[in-house]
């Protein structure tokens, strides 16, 4: 018999399912979870950006021995750094859009950067911060003269940026929830 069959919880159960009254700081929230007398059976992290998508929360959940669903610490951390993720993907032989990674680019060298992008990637291209969640700081650049603004935007989020060729086609995202015996 399944001990969790027909088990339910609602938002009034110690406020654990409701953000009201809970700490907004992820570390304080995890401390709250660790000390709760009726801690959840499993956490479904639905967080965005640094601390939420980079493996930090997953690592802290592991430290306090609270199970969670989704990607683990290593997968989350590796995917958050777009430059590192591309290195891993291409090393595994998986095709990925061509890209240029730039650390602390100097905006006075924009002519050189624009020439390099035109030669190696072409336009349109995408400029994005290396470490940001979702599409935060991402710009589509259709013409070389728009590159400066896109680089400035990406640099406002991270000192390392990626400039990536545009790929035409469908984008498909797949979330997988499973176990060792799918």
Positions of predicted regions on the chain:
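Charged helix-capping and loop-helix junction motifs
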Residues: 111-116, 140, 144
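ATP-binding N-terminal substructure of ATP-dependent carboxylate-amine bond-forming enzymes
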Residues: 1-69, 73-74, 78-84, 88-91, ...
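Phosphate-binding site of ATP-dependent enzymes
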Residues: 142-182
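Glycine-rich phosphate-binding loop of ATP-grasp-fold ATP-dependent ligases
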Residues: 96-101, 125-152, 171-173
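ATP-grasp fold ATP-binding core
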Residues: 89-90, 117-138, 159-168, 172
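Residue-level detector of anion-binding/catalytic polar loops
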Residues: 67, 95, 160
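Anionic group-transfer/hydrolysis microenvironments
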Residues: 47-50, 100, 130, 166-167, ...
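Residue-level detector of flexible, active-site-proximal loop/helix-junction positions
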Residues: 50, 75, 103-106, 133, ...
């Amino acid at each position: 018999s399944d001990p969790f069959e027909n088990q339910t919880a609602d938002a009034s159960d110690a406020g654990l399912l409701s953000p009201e009254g809970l700490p907004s700081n992820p570390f304080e929230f995890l401390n709250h979870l660790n000390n709760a007398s009726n801690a959840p059976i499993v956490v479904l992290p639905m967080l965005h950006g640094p601390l939420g998508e980079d493996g930090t929360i997953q690592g802290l959940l592991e430290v306090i021995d609270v199970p969670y669903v989704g990607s683990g610490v290593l997968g989350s951390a590796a995917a958050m750094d777009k430059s590192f993720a591309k290195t891993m993907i291409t090393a595994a032989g998986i095709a990925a859009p061509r890209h240029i990674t730039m650390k602390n680019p100097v905006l006075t060298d924009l002519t050189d950067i624009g020439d390099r992008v035109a030669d190696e990637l072409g336009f349109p291209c995408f400029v994005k911060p290396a470490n940001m969640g979702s599409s935060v700081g991402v710009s589509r650049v259709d013409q070389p003269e728009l590159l400066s603004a896109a680089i400035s935007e990406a640099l406002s989020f991270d000192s390392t940026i990626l400039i990536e060729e545009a790929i035409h086609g469908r984008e498909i995202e797949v979330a997988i929830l499973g176990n060792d015996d799918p």
